[in-house]
Amino acid sequence: GNRSNIKITVQEDLLNEKIGNGFDSHRFMTGDGLMIGGYKVPCEHKFDAHSDGDIVLHALIDSMLGALGLGDIGTHFPNTEKWKDSEGEYLFKLTNEMILEKGYSLNQIDIIVILEEPKLNTFRKNIIASLKNITGLEESNIGFKAKTSEKMGFIGNNEGAACFVMAKLTK
């Protein structure tokens, strides 16, 4: 046979994939850095949040849960004392365990972070390296883009940031 000649003969030959979308946003407050994808971006802000406010990991968690119809981050990790100041990496690990229990694994992520300042281009490689370490994904399966909102709205006024993540899970 030829490996490039892919054929579908039985149901098991089909890849079982699920796709989910996630979103998160937080206001800024005075601080010593923004947690973005498990990497602390140095600046004069931090996220005003119940946990570490890592908008990338929180949106990733939402996308993974959504792909399997398991609710959202607030369903599993509500704003209670138990989850106060939780790190996004820890919440991701718990979510990943849920996904694995359902027979799925994270296969690919595509991320868009929207903020005016700080510019993330300088930190892009560090953020991707952090995400690679946390998720176990190859760099080629991590899409990361940083955008501005062209000075419009709360993001444009540098009052906060937002993130969208699409995740693909495979069985």
Please place each PLM-identified region on the residue numbering.
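Conserved alpha/beta core of the MobA/IspD/sugar-nucleotide pyrophosphorylase nucleotidyltransferase superfamily
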Residues: 1-20
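Acidic-glycine-rich active-site phosphate/pyrophosphate-binding loop
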Residues: 23-40, 132-141
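A short glycine/serine-rich beta->alpha loop
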Residues: 41-51, 79-83, 151-155
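Short alpha-helix carrying the canonical HExxH Zn2+-binding catalytic motif
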Residues: 53-64
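Glycine- and Gly-Pro-enriched alpha-helical subdomains that act as flexible
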Residues: 63-105
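Short, conserved loop-to-beta-strand elements that form functional interface hotspots
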Residues: 110-119, 123-156
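C-terminal edge-of-domain segments
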Residues: 155-171
